[in-house]
């Protein structure tokens, strides 16, 4: 199996320019580890999210791009929301668990996490130049109205 993402900085100057741009506009990106375990996001940052509308194109909503959002899409749950399909419905004895992706911010779909997961490794390794490249995002599924 090959490693799809660089594990070392590829272009330090591109990385430094990206970091400077994010600092200039006051954006702090979540670590992938924070999205995997959102309870590790610093308490002041979690508290600041209370004032952010989950549907707004606010970069702080990136801290909500995980499976642990509550039904209100503002709070966190310990266990991600899911359904367990019974044998009577599926015809199989194995439990089939369906994770619900409608709790994600901005477009109420997990596609934002997939896009972030592809873009952020390139940002931190200097492979994505904010000045000379454009990101392509997945369709929001809202009749080609664009992405966030």
Give short role names for the model-derived ranges.
Residues 1-148:
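PLP-dependent amino-acid enzyme catalytic core
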